[in-house]
């Protein structure tokens, strides 16, 4: 593989384990949601996102109903922007009081640092909100890695399974899509990125995917088990 001009990476299942997100972050946000909404519900930023949830429901509903809706969305792993924003705010409180640190695979931390040192700009695109992404990298168990990242993208730029989202990102960072390498563990996301001309690599970590995906599903995407196998 030739050296890309920029690298765009997912987080969950790519730089970090799926189990940390599913077993630590999601349950933490679910448990904390009622108290957080009741305590901070009048804060303009929090109320903005709660209003978006109410708009989605299509009713003028009390906060208790919004809380139940948000907890249901967490159970369903909904990629709703308002949910992701509120989760990020709650996780911010958790990081602040050191309830947990964010999991980062050692190979990912080392390779991101090496690419940054080599002058390759790094970008993050995750369904989690941009503030949550920044907190994740700032409070990782490999230390503060947030300074390695040039810019961050979430679902406000569009769905991760739509090619238009990747075109917008390429335009935002000012690099031709063909010179951007996108890293993800989700084949549908890689398919969308490839339709724009981006280079792609599927992360298939044995910790997250004990059974390899079929060659037919993987298609033309490069398949690697960790970041150290990405050589250019």
Swiss-Prot record:
Organism listed in the record: Xanthomonas oryzae pv. oryzae (strain PXO99A)
First-tier enzyme category under EC: hydrolase
General function of this protein: Bifunctional enzyme that catalyzes the enolization of 2,3-diketo-5-methylthiopentyl-1-phosphate (DK-MTP-1-P) into the intermediate 2-hydroxy-3-keto-5-methylthiopentenyl-1-phosphate (HK-MTPenyl-1-P), which is then dephosphorylated to form the acireductone 1,2-dihydroxy-3-keto-5-methylthiopentene (DHK-MTPene).
Cofactor binding mode and count: Binds 1 Mg(2+) ion per subunit.
Keyword Translocase: no
Protein name listed in UniProt: Enolase-phosphatase E1
NCBIfam families the record matches: enolase-ppase, HAD-SF-IA-v1
Family the entry assigns: Belongs to the HAD-like hydrolase superfamily. MasA/MtnC family.
Gene that this sequence comes from: mtnC1
Stored InterPro entries: Enolase-ppase_E1 (IPR023943), HAD-like_sf (IPR036412), HAD-SF_hydro_IA (IPR006439), HAD_sf (IPR023214)
CDD domains: HAD_EP
Kinase listed as a keyword: no
Subunit structure: Monomer.
Molecular function as annotated in GO: 2,3-diketo-5-methylthiopentyl-1-phosphate enolase activity; 2-hydroxy-3-keto-5-methylthiopentenyl-1-phosphate phosphatase activity; acireductone synthase activity; magnesium ion binding
EC code: 3.1.3.77
UniProt keyword terms in alphabetical order: Amino-acid biosynthesis, Hydrolase, Magnesium, Metal-binding, Methionine biosynthesis
Pathway membership, UniProt: Amino-acid biosynthesis; L-methionine biosynthesis via salvage pathway; L-methionine from S-methyl-5-thio-alpha-D-ribose 1-phosphate: step 3/6; Amino-acid biosynthesis; L-methionine biosynthesis via salvage pathway; L-methionine from S-methyl-5-thio-alpha-D-ribose 1-phosphate: step 4/6
Top-level taxon of origin: Bacteria
Catalytic activity from the UniProt record: 5-methylsulfanyl-2,3-dioxopentyl phosphate + H2O = 1,2-dihydroxy-5-(methylsulfanyl)pent-1-en-3-one + phosphate
Known cofactor(s): Mg(2+)
């Amino acid at each position: 593989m030739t050296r890309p001009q920029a690298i765009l990476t997912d987080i969950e299942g790519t730089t970090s384990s799926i189990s940390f997100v599913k077993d630590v972050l999601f349950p933490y946000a679910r448990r904390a949601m009622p108290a957080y909404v009741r305590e901070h519900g009048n804060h303009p930023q929090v109320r903005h996102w709660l209003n978006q949830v109410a708009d989605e429901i299509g009713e003028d509903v009390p906060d208790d109903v919004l809380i139940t809706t948000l907890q249901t969305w967490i159970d369903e792993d909904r990629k709703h922007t308002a949910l992701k924003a509120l989760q990020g705010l709650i996780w911010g409180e958790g990081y602040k009081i050191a309830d947990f640190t964010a999991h980062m695979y050692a190979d990912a931390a080392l390779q991101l640092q090496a690419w940054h040192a080599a002058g390759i700009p790094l970008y993050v695109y995750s369904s989690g909100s941009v503030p949550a992404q920044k907190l994740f990298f700032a409070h990782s168990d490999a230390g503060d890695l947030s300074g390695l990242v040039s810019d961050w993208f979430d679902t406000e730029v569009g769905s991760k399974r739509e090619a238009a989202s990747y075109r917008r990102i390429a335009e935002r960072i000012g690099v031709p899509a063909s010179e951007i390498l996108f890293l993800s563990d989700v084949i549908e996301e890689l398919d969308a990125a490839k339709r724009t001309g981006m280079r792609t690599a599927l992360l298939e970590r044995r910790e997250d995917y004990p059974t390899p995906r079929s060659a037919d599903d993987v298609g033309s995407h490069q398949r690697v088990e960790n970041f150290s196998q990405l050589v250019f």
